[in-house]
Each structure stands twice: as structure tokens, then as C-alpha cells.
From Swiss-Prot:
Protein name: GTPase Obg
Subcellular location per the Swiss-Prot or TrEMBL entry: Cytoplasm
Chain ranges of the OBG-type G domain: 160-333
Primary location: cytoplasm
Protein's gene: obg
Species this chain originates from: Shewanella loihica (strain ATCC BAA-1088 / PV-4)
Summary of the function given for this chain in its UniProt record: An essential GTPase which binds GTP, GDP and possibly (p)ppGpp with moderate affinity, with high nucleotide exchange rates and a fairly low GTP hydrolysis rate. Plays a role in control of the cell cycle, stress response, ribosome biogenesis and in those bacteria that undergo differentiation, in morphogenesis control.
Length: 387
């Protein structure tokens, strides 16, 4: 199935049902009190993470989604039925962003996690709510409020521990094939990898991590050169980045210039991403003699003024790949657990305060001394007014 990692959709929550104006009409009760019921709340729209999905392609073709409207209230104090919520299934790792405000509504990182993206309208109040000692036959009601309407940008961001960076044909796909069972396409031309690939690495029994391979970057990617930088977002959740560098480029280019170009594109896209731990990995070391290899590595490290970790591997021959995988496993295990976002932090929705405000208005007209039990005894006494 085609890999689609971004889609724009429009979600509309259901409107709230309106309240009802109605009065009791029963035999021997000529002056029945109000019995109009409230409307039902409108259905809300939720996103739910599903581990069985791995693309947003369905939302490229189906862009408009509506939740049910709440039913209107009816007589005899019958409350309208609430609208059914709409649940949209998305892949794990999806982020929802409001297109108008650019506000991030939340991330779905675990299977079954739900996120409210459009809140249903609040129900209208029936005339029973407005009865008082001075207004025994109220004809007031309130209408249900409209449901929330949002334009959402869904962004699928892969969940991986290790991310691979590098120029096209640096050997990233070959490396992921050598350390995992993933089988991305490998060929001798640039941009063989067109979509991100994931692989599970198990360096020791009972220990594993996920590695992500994205299409190669070239200089000017931030301006749209090559495949651009749209796939860099898949590395934002990685805990460490491997900068794969071709020690002997077939085009004769200088690896130093290639490394600087990659770092420059990384900083243009996201300073936060550029600040993540990054290891320098020299690939295709089997193409050079041992003495020549060491001289070239020392020169590149010196010119880059590199202070971090440096590793030499041959992904094709699987030389040094297992040792690198073990180092990565130890590094990931030593990292502190990621700080989760505050689960109590909620997005403000349009009608969050409507219920409270409406109830305050009703309470202003309500008389505590009034008996709100409208039974037959209330009408057995004839009131006579004398001048």
C-alpha cells in the first residue's frame, strides 16, 4: 500500500438538540405545568490510534467527516437522544494539528489511545428548566449549540529509537538490512529509498530497539531539492541519530562537504532535531586499505571538528555492524525515560463554558421556595383574591 504520511481533513461535531416547549395535558389536570425536555448533546469526533494501520492514505480520498446531531427534546420531560460519537482510526504515531491556528492538539503514541478533536454541541434546555414561583407556565427554551468544526492536518511520525541520516547512496538501507530483518530496496542509483523504512534490531536476547531509515538528503533540501526535508519529521522522536557517511563516494565528492551539507539542512529544518545526540558512522570502509582508511577518517574528523562518537563499518560485509548495534542498545538503555506530556492538559473547545453560563442564567430566575413537584394536589385548592 502507498505510504502517505500527511493528510488534511475537515471534522464536524454534531449540533446539540434544542429544548422543547410543552405542557402537561391530562384529564382532570386543566392547568398542567411545563414538561418540555432538554435536547441531546451532539456527537464528538475522536482520533484513535490503531497499530494495524501504517498509512494515512484513506484520508486523502475521504476528507469530510461528520458526527451525529443530538435529537430535540420532547414533551413529558423526554430528553433527546445524544448524537453518536465518530471515531476515526489512524496509525500509531499520528499528530493532529489545527490548520487555522497551527495548534498541536495532541499525539497518539500508543495503540488504542484516543484524542478529542471536535467537541459536540451542548444540548438546549426545555421549558421545565425555566419554571419558577412567578413564571409557572414558561415558554422559554434554548437552542442547542453548533458542534465544533475544525480543519485538521494529520501528520504520521514514525516511532523509532534510532534514525539514519545521510546523502543518497551512503549505505543507509544496506545498514538497516544488515542489522535487522527489514528488506528495503537497495540499488546503485540515488534516491532508491523513496519512503521511510523501519527495522527492529535485536542485538541481545530480550533486548531490541527500532531503527528508521529515511530517504537521503542533499544540499538545498530545505528549498525543495531532491525529495526535500519532509521526511525529517520522522526522526523527531528518535533518541539518537546515526550520520552515515560514505568514506569513498563514487562521484569523487569530499565527505566533509557532504557532512556539512547534511548538518546545515538539519539545522534549517529544526534546531531541536539538530541538537539530538548524533554519531558519525563511516561506511564502505572495505573499499580502502587499513592505513589509508585511518588517515582519511582522522582528516575528516579534524576538518569537521567532530567531538562525538565515531564508528567505522562496512554494511555490505556486515563488518562492525553488530558492535555498533550493541553500542546503540547500551546507549538507549542508559538514557533516562522520556518525559510524557501532561495528560491533564486539554485543548480549549468552543463550548466548554456554555453549560456553566447557561445554568447561571437559569439559576438567577429560580426561586428556592418554590415546590417544583407538579402533581395533582397543586391544583386542588382554588385561590380566591379579595379586594
Amino acid at each position: 500500500m502507498k505510504f502517505v504520511d500527511e493528510a488534511v481533513i475537515r471534522v464536524e461535531a454534531g449540533d446539540g438538540g434544542s429544548g422543547c416547549v410543552s405542557f402537561r395535558r391530562e384529564k382532570y389536570v386543566p392547568d398542567g405545568g411545563p414538561d418540555g425536555g432538554d435536547g441531546g448533546d451532539g456527537g464528538s469526533v475522536y482520533l484513535q490510534a490503531d497499530e494495524n494501520l501504517n498509512t494515512l492514505i484513506d484520508y486523502r480520498f475521504e476528507r469530510f467527516h461528520f458526527a451525529e446531531r443530538g435529537e430535540n427534546g420532547r414533551g413529558r420531560d423526554c430528553t433527546g437522544h445524544g448524537g453518536k460519537d465518530l471515531i476515526l482510526k489512524v496509525p500509531v504515531g499520528t499528530r493532529a494539528v489545527d490548520e487555522e491556528t497551527q495548534e498541536a492538539l495532541g499525539d497518539l503514541k500508543t495503540h488504542g489511545q484516543k484524542l478529542l478533536v471536535a467537541k459536540g454541541g451542548f444540548h438546549g434546555l426545555g421549558n421545565t428548566r425555566f419554571k419558577s414561583s412567578t413564571n409557572r407556565a414558561p415558554r422559554q427554551k434554548t437552542l442547542g449549540t453548533p458542534g465544533e468544526v475544525r480543519s485538521l492536518r494529520l501528520e504520521l511520525m514514525l516511532l523509532a529509537d534510532v534514525g539514519l541520516l545521510g546523502m543518497p547512496n551512503a549505505g543507509k538501507s544496506t545498514f538497516i538490512r544488515s542489522v535487522s530483518r527489514a528488506k528495503p530496496k537497495v540499488a546503485d542509483y540515488p534516491f532508491t529509498t523513496l519512503v521511510p523504512n523501519l527495522g527492529v534490531v535485536t542485538p541481545r536476547h530480550g533486548q531490541s530497539f527500532v531503527i528508521a531509515d529515511i530517504p537521503g538528503l542533499i544540499e538545498g533540501a530545505a528549498e525543495g531539492a531532491g525529495l526535500g526535508i519532509r521526511f525529517l519529521k520522522h526522526l523527531e522522536r528518535c533518541r539518537v541519530l546515526l550520520h552515515i557517511l560514505d568514506i569513498e563516494p563514487i562521484d569523487g565528492s569530499d565527505p566533509v562537504d557532504s557532512a556539512r551539507a547534511i548538518v546545515g539542512e538539519l539545522e534549517k529544518h529544526s534546531p531541536l532535531l539538530a541538537s539530538k545526540p548524533r554519531w558519525l558512522v563511516f561506511n564502505k570502509t572495505d573499499l580502502l586499505l587499513e592505513e589509508e582508511l585511518q588517515e582519511r577518517v582522522d582528516r575528516i574528523v579534524k576538518e569537521l571538528d567532530w567531538q562525538g562518537d565515531v564508528y567505522c563499518i562496512s554494511a555490505y560485509n556486515r563488518e562492525g555492524t553488530q558492535e555498533l548495534a550493541l553500542k546503540l542498545m547500551d546507549f538507549i538503555d542508559a538514557l533516562p525515560p522520556e518525559v510524557e506530556e501532561d495528560p491533564d492538559a486539554e485543548v480549549e473547545f468552543k463550548w466548554d463554558n456554555y453549560h456553566q453560563k447557561t445554568q447561571e442564567v437559569v439559576n438567577e430566575d429560580y426561586d428556592d421556595d418554590f415546590d417544583d413537584d407538579f402533581d395533582d394536589d397543586d391544583y386542588d385548592v382554588e385561590i380566591i383574591y379579595q379586594r
